[in-house]
Amino acid sequence: MSSETVAQHYNAVRQEGVAGRAESRIFYLRNLNNWMKSELINEALHMLRDEAVNKMFRPRVLDLACGKGGDLRKWKIANVDSIVMADVADVSLSQAKERYDEMAQRERYGLFRAEFVHADCCKDNLKSLMKSHPEFDLVSCQFALHYSFIDEQSARTFLRNATETLRPGGFLIGTLPDAERIVWAVRENDGEFKNAVCSVRYDNKDEMERPPLFGAKFHFTLDSQVNCPEFLAYFPLVKHLLEELDMELVFMRRFPEALRHWKTTGAGLLSRMQGLEPYPPRNGAKLSAEDNEYEQAKEFVKTLDSSENPSIGTLSKSEWEAFCMYLVFAFRKKGGSQAAAPSSAKSKLDEESPVESKRRRTEEHGEAATS
């Protein structure tokens, strides 16, 4: 599979309106994923501003594999100075520019500057294609890095593009399918994991027990929204390749861990973004899934004071299982201020024994997100 295949797939994905998104079976999962990205961006901005001399600091951002520009509003809220948006899918990139232009027209005091670059970041030198040549403070790559792991050269080229123009002390952040979790899920289900909203099938059953570091193809479908071959990006390998590029790990958190980490400070935004489904449903609303998808939420509500008509935020079991298949990460380029230097703690992938790792995966498989 080539980058052209990925571009053709995402170019063909229909742009959905607000009404269509609200009716989606994965409405809450989508919102929760968006909230996760918002919190990740917020944490990176806090680290950048903590070390900045000028507390009115406005970062220069590279949005790598920006798609249709779904994070443009997040960058507006983040008060960025400028942004370069790059993607291999030309139709998606055009839609991102249209979205930016519409936002700019509505802004009374102007919007951040933006450049849109059509590039195959697995092959091209992105820096040479930019009209502007900024040193970026922040590079963001959301749900896309793993496509480059089709082979070693593509992965190395993509990561070089992600880090080459990042200033010392700047951050690379992103979201990524959790290769360890995916391999566990397909092994436990004879090569294919499937529930009401997603399916994951590993391409070559014969190599499931020992997938290759590059070119480990799997097929992921989420509510019929994504059905393009993807590739496992084993996080310790990602970390190793980035360390060769003078990057150091700040944190890696699997989505359930990240949700727990941000849930308290980000509770208001989580509620406004409707990232969790109210249970029991309010005002005669219907649940987004069958009642048996909320067994853990039902049992948890029973432990609360019934006189107060308690309600919690949760996800259906199927959405939660899909949510658990991702992780977030942040790397920092060496040099610059040490104010945001990473902790010396190892990631769970580095420190867990096989027994501990298996127990954690089993616990997450049955866990429900509640607040």
Residue ranges and their predicted role:
Residues 168-177:
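Conserved beta-strand signature within the Rossmann-like core of class I S-adenosyl-L-methionine
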Residues 136-154:
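A short SAM/SAH-binding and catalytic strip from SAM-dependent methyltransferases
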Residues 56-67, 84:
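Conserved class I S-adenosyl-L-methionine
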Residues 127-139:
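A short acidic, Gly/Pro-enriched loop at the edge of an enzyme's catalytic core
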Residues 154-168:
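A short glycine-rich, Lys/Arg-flanked "PGG" loop and its adjoining helix->strand segment in the class I
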Residues 2-55:
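Class I SAM-dependent methyltransferase Rossmann-like catalytic core
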Residues 70-124:
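Class I SAM-dependent methyltransferase SAM/SAH-binding core
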Residues 187, 193-196, 205-371:
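C-terminal lobe and adjacent flexible extensions of AdoMet/dcAdoMet transferase-like proteins
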